[in-house]
Design a protein with these regions (language model features):
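Conserved catalytic segments around the Walker B and adjacent sensor/switch elements
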Residues: 2-15
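Short glycine-rich substrate-engagement loop in P-loop NTPases that contacts/grips substrate
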Residues: 13-39
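Conserved P-loop NTPase "ATPase switch" module shared by AAA+ and STAND
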Residues: 41-55
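Signature of the SF2 helicase/ATPase Hel1-core->accessory helical subdomain module
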Residues: 67, 79-91
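Structural recognition of the conserved hydrophobic beta-strand(s) that form the central parallel beta-sheet
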Residues: 73-79
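Interdomain motor-coupling "hinge/lid" segment immediately C-terminal to the ATP-binding subdomain
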Residues: 86-202
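Accessory nucleic acid-recognition modules appended to NTPase machines
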Residues: 159-304
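Positively charged, low-complexity/disordered segments
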Residues: 305-306, 310-311
Length: 311
């Protein structure tokens, strides 16, 4: 346990943003932290560097904390770290531990909105009892598909139960991603990144069995958009899911790299990009049928088996 923490957000702190430019003298950096936060850093202090990708050489500095001052514990967080690790910064390989954070899963959403009993029920896979509460679970699943799992959005939904506020926050997040394209991506790739990003809902709404470059731009070829897709994957904004030739073990051995689909990182953001209205929550199973299953679970069965497997 820590007695206190010293928090630095490099996105809105111009003084600290350049603190690593001169050198990596840990004592000098600790003094700067004290001057900015008013916290005297000791071994019972957790140092938090937020949006570390905004600080030039910030990632490199972590190496020197680990090598020269391991008694101090540092947590570094940030968006687009996958992109930052491909920049000119020297990444401290072997000096840091990773923890990836994702949008809330359905079970985590249930726990967050006070439905822990249903989360436990699903974890136990008591299919008889699950069937008995089918209607309630479907309503909760609809909520999840609309709200999604972005922490700020879920927190607002818990506090206010306002679907209009949910959509407004989701749109704000989408707008911030769009700004990040211009800020962090190679200038030449920005237009293609935006085209790929904006095409995802339209791609998933079609009957296509794979991603079609012609939907992005008429006459487009794979090589024109490969870097844009990789940038979005590195940024953690989309998932690339390849087709498999058969459901064997290990699944990766049967991956068909020539055919894939792209999915957004969050179901709520997917709905916001698609313009899905709150009324969809009341319209039967529209949330499950629209977008060809892109925001719901999928089932697989082989011709030789009667079993259904979740995918």
């Amino acid at each position: 346990a820590y007695r206190q923490f010293a928090y630095i957000n490099f996105e809105d702190n111009e003084v600290m943003k350049d603190v690593f430019q001169k050198d990596f003298d840990v004592e000098r950096i600790l003094m700067a932290i004290q001057l900015v936060t008013g916290i005297v850093v000791d071994t019972e202090t957790l140092i938090i560097f937020d949006e570390i990708q905004e600080a030039p050489r910030g990632l490199t500095a972590l190496k020197y904390f680990q090598e020269k001052a391991p008694q101090y514990h540092v947590v570094a967080a940030g968006s687009l770290l996958g992109i930052a690790m491909h920049s000119n910064d020297s990444f401290p390989v072997g000096k840091v531990d990773f923890m990836d954070l994702y949008p809330l899963s359905f079970s985590e959403f249930l726990e967050a909105v006070g439905q822990e009993a249903f989360a436990r029920l699903l974890a136990k896979k008591d299919w008889g009892l699950i069937a008995a509460f089918r209607s309630k679970l479907i309503d909760l699943l609809k909520q999840y598909y609309y709200v999604g799992g972005m922490p700020e959005v879920v927190n607002a939904f818990i506090n206010h139960k306002d679907y209009a506020e949910v959509r407004q926050l989701q749109q704000t997040i989408l707008d911030s991603y769009d700004r990040d394209f211009s800020k962090h991506a190679p200038i030449a790739e920005v237009p293609r990144i935006r085209m790929i990003w904006r095409s995802v809902p339209a791609q998933l709404a079609k009957e296509n069995k794979k991603f079609i470059y012609g939907v992005v731009k008429e006459g487009a070829r794979a090589k024109d958009f490969e870097l844009a897709i990789e940038w979005l994957i590195d940024a953690g904004l989309i998932y690339k899911v390849s087709r498999v030739k058969k459901a064997g073990i290990p699944l990766s051995a049967y991956e068909d790299f020539s055919a894939f689909k792209l999915f957004l990182l969050d179901t709520g953001l997917m709905g916001a990009m698609s313009g899905l209205p709150p009324q969809a929550l009341l319209e039967g199973n529209v949330l499950f049928s629209d977008y060809k299953g892109a925001i719901t679970c999928l089932l697989y069965t082989s011709d030789a088996a009667d079993e259904l497997d979740g995918v």
